[in-house]
């Protein structure tokens, strides 16, 4: 007899993890889940500046900047990693070379995220796609050392910066 935890774990593995891991998609499933979860929690996250970028917008960014498989991408406010997922998907589609694909995942995607819970989601998102969160950092972009950013050698930047519509009484949000 299966325990509830065992049943739930098997369900997640069969119906979610396997679909995300092997699906060739730029969809930010964890971001969508987070957004849906926030809608049931009594808030939408917007008061904290949390507005997730839709997939069609992240894909449009990749098209507009004419992303190449050799580019290195930085999202300084990566949230759930939607832009990095779209960039990775786009760049992987542009090469059949296994070594280049490995390099894209390991070296060419960089993200910074200040919020710990969003950093956890972005890290999980990238691990599920075989990236291993190699270049994600829980850091404040505005306080990040510019010379360290230059060392990353990024050729493209993509971002949807957080903004707040909350109370001006909470100056930490501005």
Which stretches of residues belong to each language-model region?
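Long, N-terminal intrinsically disordered regulatory "head" regions
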Residues: 169-174
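Conserved S-adenosyl-L-methionine
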Residues: 47-156, 164-168
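Long recognition/docking surfaces used for binding and targeting
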Residues: 1-41
């Amino acid at each position: 007899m299966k325990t509830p935890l065992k049943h739930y774990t098997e369900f997640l593995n069969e119906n979610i993890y396997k679909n995300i891991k092997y699906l060739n998609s730029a969809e930010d499933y964890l971001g969508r889940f987070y957004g849906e979860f926030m809608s049931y929690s009594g808030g939408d996250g917007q008061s904290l500046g949390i507005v997730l970028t839709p997939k069609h917008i992240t894909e449009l960014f990749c098209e507009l900047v004419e992303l190449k498989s050799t580019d290195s991408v930085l999202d300084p406010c990566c949230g759930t990693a939607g832009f990095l997922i779209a960039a990775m998907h786009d760049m992987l589609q542009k090469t059949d070379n296994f070594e280049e694909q490995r390099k894209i995942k390991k070296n060419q995607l960089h993200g910074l995220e200040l919020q710990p819970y969003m950093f956890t989601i972005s890290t999980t998102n990238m691990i599920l796609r075989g990236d291993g969160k190699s270049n994600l950092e829980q850091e404040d972009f505005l306080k990040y050392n510019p010379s360290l950013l230059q060392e990353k050698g990024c050729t493209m930047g993509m971002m949807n910066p957080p903004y707040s519509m909350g109370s001006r009484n909470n100056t930490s949000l501005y």
